[in-house]
Amino acid sequence: ELTFNVTGSARNTSLIGNALDRGVGYFGPRKDDLFGLEVVCGSGQIIKTGFRRLGEDSPLAHSHPFGLGPMLDGLFFQGNFGIVTSACFRLMPRRPKEVAVSLALRDSSNLGLFIDELARLKREGLMASVTHIANKARSQASMMFGMTTYLKDFCNFSDTNALIEAEKAVQVVAPNEWTSLGAITGNTGQVAAAIKEIKQRMKKLARVSVITDGLLDVGYAVM
């Protein structure tokens, strides 16, 4: 089963447009995922980059990003040398286990050390995804929409009561001034080992919470 480097954007947004503008997905910059461009130039000429120039029937056309000789792809990222009408996206195997890891900084004065350690976790591959870092206002605002929507749609709360209850809840679950959120992926053993290492490194700096699908299901059931 395959997946690709998605963003958190709405489903109506442009996949190619985001990558051409050097957008970022959950697993890193999306410019690295796009190759084999079909481009209409200002002269009306249609060019295909990489091995797509060999034709769509070639086994190399959609499977390898690098052709022979210089790569033209970079001309069309955040550029106006032509209009990209189609492209290939790099796919990746879906990992058998995925968990979210939330790190809540204990002392705001250690923010610099916190960011440095998060960067090391990413470089060493312990954190598989891009890690979001948010202050309290951002964290609570992000949670409020989901909580109020759930309370209204599934618990029959009025708009006012849903807002009141959600505000109480976010004060409990997101009280810290700075929080990060990232993901760990892999097989069961890899994920367990990564969580153990992250807890060991971060125990003095942050409170570590591991969020699984099962834990979310329990939370929704309780609500």
Language model segments and positions:
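FAD-binding subdomain of flavoenzyme oxidoreductases
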Residues: 2-124
